[in-house]
Amino acid sequence: MDTKLSVTGAKKSQGKASGLGNEGTPIGNEESTNKAKNGNKKRNKNRNRNKKTETKEQNEPKPVTGGEEVRVEKSQAKNRRRKNNNGANKKNTLHYSKEINVEERKQIAKRQEEIEQCIHTLSDFKLFKKGKHVTSYGYRISPMTDSGKISLKILFNIPLDYPKAPIKLTMKSNEEVSSYMDTVIANFNWKARQLVKEDWRILSQINYLVSELEILKMENYKQIDKLRNSFYKTI
């Protein structure tokens, strides 16, 4: 009997022990789970802390050494000079273009006004041809020759940039040109360069041609004109 009781008691004690072991297993799992969660939290905190540190380092300017500081200052100064030069050039270009436009308008107005004066005053002064760079007006003169007075149709070519460029005298293509008219044309065109610089109007230049025609026929006209100008300066 005693032997059976001891065996039975041993079995019961083993059953209790095994029961206690089974009851302790969930507690152990819960503790390990909590440890894992805490470990993850710590790792996440460390990651966030590292990210903040990296971001801060990126945002904060790096210390500049002496050589780098000089290079940065030179680059900034160069950029400022380039910006100032571009601004100044732009202003100068705009100012210059405005001046050109104003000067061109004055030039065109002066040219047109002088042409209209010739048309109004001279009945034979008529438009002959409009070109890309010059406008030609026909005019008839009556020079005296050895065989008497003749009528010739001449052309005054007025450039579009007159009075910057002088007018130019030519003969109409179907007109018979004598040698003395070649001399007249060459001498007048030489004189016209001087007259436009002295601000002679187109009408006054035409009057000069008509009134000085006999002198313009001379081969030594340039010498005569220079002597005449020297004489007038002494008066």
From Swiss-Prot:
GO terms for cellular component: cytoplasm. There is a cross-link at K16, K35 (Glycyl lysine isopeptide (Lys-Gly) (interchain with G-Cter in ubiquitin)). It comes from the Eukaryota. Keywords: Isopeptide bond, Ubl conjugation. Residues 51-60 have a biased composition (Basic and acidic residues). Residues 38-50 have a biased composition (Basic residues). One of its GO terms (biological process) is nonfunctional rRNA decay. Residues 1-98 are annotated as: Disordered. Present with 1230 molecules/cell in log phase SD medium. This is Uncharacterized protein YIL161W.
